[in-house]
Amino acid sequence: MSIRTEKVASLLQQELGMILEKEFPRGGPILTVVEVKVTADLGIAKVYVSVIGSAKEQADTIEYLQQEKKNIRKILSSKIRHHFRRIPELEFYQDRLYEKADRIEQLLKEVRKEQE
């Protein structure tokens, strides 16, 4: 990634985090914007979110974000329009890094128990 795309991704991550917290409060699972990856032409922003909750809550939250992405983009545009000529299209994905890390930790604990 170039320096520009990194700066854009960082700005989008901060703003989207605030938007999701303030403009779209939902009771239920905790939602965190973990990472944003922007294409070189700044046309698409892939937003990776971490959802802490049951599997159904996670799926419902991602589905909700996909349905609301036009509204989220509109709010984002009103907040950062002076930075961009065109606001990137948003694509939401669930970040599964924490689940993978938890699984690795469980496996390591099992190995340690077997060695004792």
UniProtKB/Swiss-Prot annotation:
InterPro entries in UniProt: KH_dom-like_a/b, RbfA, RbfA_dom_sf
Cellular compartments per GO CC: cytosol
Subcellular localization: Cytoplasm
GO MF annotation list: ribosomal small subunit binding
Pfam families to which the protein is assigned, alphabetical: RBFA
GO biological process: maturation of SSU-rRNA
Cited SUPFAM superfamilies: Ribosome-binding factor A, RbfA (SSF89919)
Keywords: Cytoplasm, Ribosome biogenesis
Family: Belongs to the RbfA family.
Function in brief: One of several proteins that assist in the late maturation steps of the functional core of the 30S ribosomal subunit. Associates with free 30S ribosomal subunits (but not with 30S subunits that are part of 70S ribosomes or polysomes). Required for efficient processing of 16S rRNA. May interact with the 5'-terminal helix region of 16S rRNA.
NCBIfam families in alphabetical order: rbfA (TIGR00082)
Subunit record text: Monomer. Binds 30S ribosomal subunits, but not 50S ribosomal subunits or 70S ribosomes.
Protein name in the entry: Ribosome-binding factor A
Organism: Chlorobium phaeobacteroides (strain DSM 266 / SMG 266 / 2430)
